[in-house]
């Protein structure tokens, strides 16, 4: 059998655009197809799937082949508990160098005092942040007050009292329905709600925007140890100067989760009071989403927290993932480029044009529009659920995700809205003209969904159906867009058949 690599090289002979990265990618697939066919085939299927859908899930993006290749190597075999140059294992010199470079690059990119690049995910980064705050602000002073140097010197009774004090600390953060994340403390099924006493703040029911006066009132009432700011489904920017003042007025630590908009900070779109770095005590983020890196987490902080973050292991982590840290380094270096800054600005320009087009068609968006990379469509006037819209749009090649509204009568599973974002489409090179085309396709699909009642066991459930003519038209328009803006154009899918 002629290998994928051989076919690729034959087809690429004499053509411009062939790269070492694409050659390496095909070589890896060749090996997997021979050694573990089921895995190799699934990777190819996923590539085909991503190349046949408009990826509009706001939390997703496309990483470069360089980022992906940095993950696929023997760095995964190295244990490196500890921090650079202070490991619990020997022979970590190369991993030390990589992690040190990653830390320094993160500090340069975000103009931060210190950085921890070890968290495996955004949820891990958030957990590390809250543990660092409790350790530094509660445990440290308590240990010193008792005349000890370390927590290990406490008696069992003293340690029990310390744990009770830590768990009694108050956290004030955005509710899930108002755009917060499940790790912001207000979802009882999540571990964060079990670490502290958590209280939510919500968007204003009329403006659907966060009300700083109300947040200030709640902060004065609850006196939180931690004030959380950030979002996963909120389409406006935040004023971190105001939030910092609220935190200072009630003696709170300001923790910002910028997982969704880190790339917009790195790219110079969010500046001054919209940039959390000069104002927050601790900032967490993922390294994918708008940063276009590997799946992973990152914590940035003021110098005050540096020694605590350097003890991420054993605070809440064991061994970091050095192969992913290598990929994070690549992505962060890519984000330092002029091209990335242009990309970040285009993401927001595209989102605004997309929102304007939806509004011109008469759809309702939460907050009335967007100032960042995403928006949430209220489907109430169309009489369909977010789950139905998500499924039907997926069937014509458009990937979105259902999203609950601040006052959602349907519930968190089916929801009354869908969330859309522009990071991935912008990575493909699409601009404002394409956003208008995409909006037109989506609106036509949504407005032509018909509901039919189906019996499932003892219950009745609505199911969405789309006339085949409308569905085929949408598929054709999506296909034409993706042919003009292919994912990884240097990789010929014909060679993968």
From Swiss-Prot:
GO terms for cellular component: cytosol. Its cofactor is pyridoxal 5'-phosphate. Its EC number is 2.1.2.1. It catalyses: (6R)-5,10-methylene-5,6,7,8-tetrahydrofolate + glycine + H2O = (6S)-5,6,7,8-tetrahydrofolate + L-serine. The modification N6-(pyridoxal phosphate)lysine is found at residue 289. One of its GO terms (biological process) is tetrahydrofolate interconversion. It is found in: Cytoplasm. GO terms for molecular function: glycine hydroxymethyltransferase activity; pyridoxal phosphate binding. (6S)-5,6,7,8-tetrahydrofolate binds at residues 176, 180-182, 306. Belongs to the SHMT family. Catalyzes the reversible interconversion of serine and glycine with tetrahydrofolate (THF) serving as the one-carbon carrier. This reaction serves as the major source of one-carbon groups required for the biosynthesis of purines, thymidylate, methionine, and other important biomolecules. Also exhibits THF-independent aldolase activity toward beta-hydroxyamino acids, producing glycine and aldehydes, via a retro-aldol mechanism. This is Serine hydroxymethyltransferase. It comes from Chlamydia pneumoniae.
């Amino acid at each position: 059998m002629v290998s994928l690599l051989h076919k690729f090289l034959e087809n690429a002979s004499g053509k411009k655009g062939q790269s070492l990265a694409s050659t390496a990618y095909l070589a890896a697939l060749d090996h997997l197809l021979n050694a573990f066919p089921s895995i190799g085939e699934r990777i190819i299927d996923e590539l085909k799937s991503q190349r046949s859908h408009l990826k509009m899930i706001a939390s997703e993006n496309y990483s470069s082949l360089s980022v992906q290749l940095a993950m696929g190597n023997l760095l995964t075999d190295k244990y490196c508990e500890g921090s650079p140059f202070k490991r619990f294992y020997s022979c970590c010199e190369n991993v030390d160098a990589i992690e040190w470079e990653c830390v320094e690059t993160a500090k340069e990119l975000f103009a931060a005092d210190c950085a921890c690049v070890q968290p495996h995910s955004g949820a891990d980064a958030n957990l590390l942040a809250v543990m660092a705050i409790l350790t530094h602000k509660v445990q440290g002073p308590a240990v010193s007050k008792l005349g000890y140097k370390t927590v290990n010197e406490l008696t069992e009774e003293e340690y029990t009292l310390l744990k009770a004090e830590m768990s009694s600390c108050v956290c004030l953060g955005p509710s899930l329905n108002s755009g917060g994340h499940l790790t912001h403390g207000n979802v009882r099924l999540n571990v964060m709600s079990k670490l502290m006493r958590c209280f939510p703040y919500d968007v204003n029911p009329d403006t659907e925007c966060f009300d700083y006066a109300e947040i200030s009132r709640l902060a004065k009432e609850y006196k939180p140890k931690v004030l959380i700011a950030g979002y996963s489904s909120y389409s406006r920017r935040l004023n971190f100067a105001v939030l910092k003042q609220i935190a200072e007025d009630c003696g709170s630590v300001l923790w910002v989760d910028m997982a969704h908009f880190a790339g917009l900070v790195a790219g110079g779109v969010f500046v001054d009071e919209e940039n959390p770095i000069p104002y927050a005590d601790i900032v967490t983020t993922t390294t994918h989403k708008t940063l276009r890196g590997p799946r992973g987490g990152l914590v940035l902080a003021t110098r005050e927290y540096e020694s605590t973050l350097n003890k991420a292991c054993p605070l809440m982590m064991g061994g970091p993932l050095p192969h992913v840290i290598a990929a994070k380094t690549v992505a962060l270096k890519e984000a330092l480029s002029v091209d990335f800054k242009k990309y970040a600005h285009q993401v927001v320009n595209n989102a605004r044009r997309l929102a304007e087009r939806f509004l011109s068609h008469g759809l309702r968006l939460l907050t009335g529009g967007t100032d960042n990379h995403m928006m949430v469509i209220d489907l109430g006037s169309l009489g369909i659920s977010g789950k139905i819209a998500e499924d039907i749009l997926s069937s014509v090649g458009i990937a979105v995700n259902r999203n609950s509204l601040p006052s959602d009568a349907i519930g968190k599973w089916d929801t009354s809205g869908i969330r859309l974002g522009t990071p991935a489409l912008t990575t493909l090179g699409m601009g404002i003209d394409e956003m208008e085309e995409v909006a037109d396709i989506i609106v036509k699909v949504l407005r032509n969904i018909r509901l039919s009642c189906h019996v499932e066991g003892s219950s009745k459930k609505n199911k969405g159906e789309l006339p085949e003519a409308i569905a085929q038209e949408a598929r054709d328009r999506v296909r034409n867009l993706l042919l003009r803006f292919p994912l990884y154009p240097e990789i010929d899918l014909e060679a993968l058949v």
